[in-house]
Amino acid sequence: MSNNNNSPTTVNQETTTSREVSITLPTDQSPQTSPGSSSSPSPRPSGGSPARRTATGLSGKHSIFRGIRLRNGKWVSEIREPRKTTRIWLGTYPVPEMAAAAYDVAALALKGPDAVLNFPGLALTYVAPVSNSAADIRAAASRAAEMKQPDQGGDEKVLEPVQPGKEEELEEVSCNSCSLEFMDEEAMLNMPTLLTEMAEGMLMSPPRMMIHPTMEDDSPENHEGDNLWSYK
């Protein structure tokens, strides 16, 4: 009988121990899974790719515009010469849009119309450099950057190329056309004395004025002529 009473007690102790183990096992494994959770204070670096998606990456390059980079708080624009390792410095600008426009002018000059531009819609408004020298390209790039210069209100300036002297030529032509519309013929032909001069040149007296019958003169001279012819 004593053996039968001891056996159930042993089984209960074993089951109790197994329950305790089953309860304590999850708590032992929980610290191992915590480093992989989202609340970890030190995640693994992703190789720099998230930094590339920002406005400026680790190297200072812009994520949208080509040929510019951030350096000391300003945007530097530069372009590599074709088939060379040298670069042409195009200037330093306060906003990225100005530096991007400067790059576009240089890209068109060095790579032609097939160049990839930051502002393709403004390609026809850019003034091409005089030559492909670094100085001429830099000067043309500076003019293009001024077109993207923001004013005090934050809006960009839109500058249209104006040909020097064009307005003066238009005004001069309009004034000449106005002067030709009015011509003083009497002053040019001297109309008051024209007929008299013609008569003197032909040795003829000017024609007499016709007198209306009702305005005939009743002077004796006129009646004398009538009286002479009235006698037979």
Curated annotation (Swiss-Prot):
Location in the cell: Nucleus
UniProt feature, compositional bias: Polar residues: 1-29
Disordered: region residues: 1-63, 213-232
Biological process (GO), any one: ethylene-activated signaling pathway
Keywords, sorted A to Z: Activator, DNA-binding, Ethylene signaling pathway, Nucleus, Transcription, Transcription regulation
Transcription regulation recorded as keyword: yes
GO cellular component: nucleus
GO molecular function annotations of the record: DNA-binding transcription factor activity; transcription cis-regulatory region binding
Pfam family, one: AP2
Keyword Transferase: no
DNA-binding positions: 64-120
Extent of Low complexity compositional bias: 30-50
Family statement drawn from the similarity comment of this UniProt entry: Belongs to the AP2/ERF transcription factor family. ERF subfamily.
Role description: Probably acts as a transcriptional activator. Binds to the GCC-box pathogenesis-related promoter element. May be involved in the regulation of gene expression by stress factors and by components of stress signal transduction pathways.
Name of the molecule in the record: Ethylene-responsive transcription factor ERF025
Name of the gene encoding the protein in the UniProt record: ERF025
